[in-house]
Amino acid sequence: VVASSETALATLGIGCPFFFSQNDGTLMSAEFAARFPVRTFASGPTNSIRGAGFLAGVQDALVVDIGGTTTDVGALRRGYPRESANTTELAGLRTNFRMPDLVSIGIGGGSHVSVGDTHVTVGPRSVGRLLTQQALVFSGSTLTATDIAVAAGLLDVGDPGAVAHLPRAQVEQALATITRDVERAVDAMRVSSDDLPVILVGGGAPLVGLDAFHGQPVIRPDHGHVANAVGSAIAHAGGESDRIYNLDKMSREEAVSLAEAEAREQCVGPAASLAVEIVELDALPLTYLPGQSVRIRVKAAGPPAA
C-alpha cells in the first residue's frame, strides 16, 4: 500500500510527505506504516469517531457511524477514540495489540430487509457497493434499508415511486428494528453512568429515528455523512510510549517524565516539535510483579510538520 501510494502521488506530480491514519485517531508516517501495518487496522472507524467529535464540537460522546454495510459504535474520550481493554481476535487468532473499543452490527444502507408473516428483519446481509444497482429505488429487485428510508421520507435518493407500494406498517416496523438494534449497540458501549451525548454520522444516519438516548440529546452534525474524511483531515501526528517502570529505582514523577519524553520523541519528525502535546496518560500499578512496578502509557500528538 505504501509503495502504491508513493507511485500514485508521483504520477500526479505530488512530492510532499504523506501520512496514514492509525487506529488511535492519529497519523503515522509512511515509513512507520510500512514497519507496523497492523496499526492501520480499524483506522476507518476511528477517523469517523474523531470527525464526529470535531463536527459536533464535543470532546466526550458516544459515536454511531452508519455506513453501507455495518454500523460502528465507539466512544470519544477527551477528543480521541477510547481504546479497547479486551483482547482482539483477527482471523481466529488472539492478539494483544492496540485496537479501538468498538461494537459493530450488520446494519447499513445496503442491508437486506426481509419481510415475514409477523416480523421484519434488517441485515446482516447487504448489497454493499452494489446498492445503486440492486436497491428498489435504483431500479433493482432487492428491498434494502435505503428503500425503507426513502419510503418513509427520510432520504431523497433514487425513484421514490419504486417504493410507494410498501405498506406503511412494514416501513415503520423496519425502522423500529433498526433503531432498536442501534440502541442496544450504544448501550453496550456505555461503561459508566456518565451522561454522554450520542453523535449520529455516516451516510446511513437517516435510518435511525433517535432524538434522545437515556435523556441525552442525539446530535446530527452538519456534513455528518463525511465524518470519516473529516476525521482523517484533522488528525494530528501521534507518538506513544507503553512501558513498565520499577518505582524502587526512581520516583513516579521521573518515570512519567521518561514516558512522556519517549512519546514526544516518537511524535517529533512527522509533527512540529513545538506543537506536540501529551493528550493521554495512564499509570497502572502492577501488583503481581515484585517491588513497586507500574505500567505507564502516554500518547502525544501534534499537527504534521510543514
Q: Where do the language-model regions lie?
A:
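Conserved P-loop NTPase mechanochemical-coupling segment
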Residues: T26-L27, E31-V38, P167
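Helical "lid/coupling" subdomains associated with nucleotide-phosphate turnover
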Residues: V38-D60, G74-A306
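Acidic-glycine-rich active-site phosphate/pyrophosphate-binding loop
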Residues: G15-E31, L200-H214
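Glycine-rich phosphate-binding loop and adjoining helix at the ATP-binding site
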Residues: V1-F20, R39, T46-N47
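Generic enzyme active-site microenvironment
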Residues: V63
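Short acidic, Gly/Ser-rich segments with clustered Asp/Glu that frequently serve as metal-coordination loops
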Residues: T69
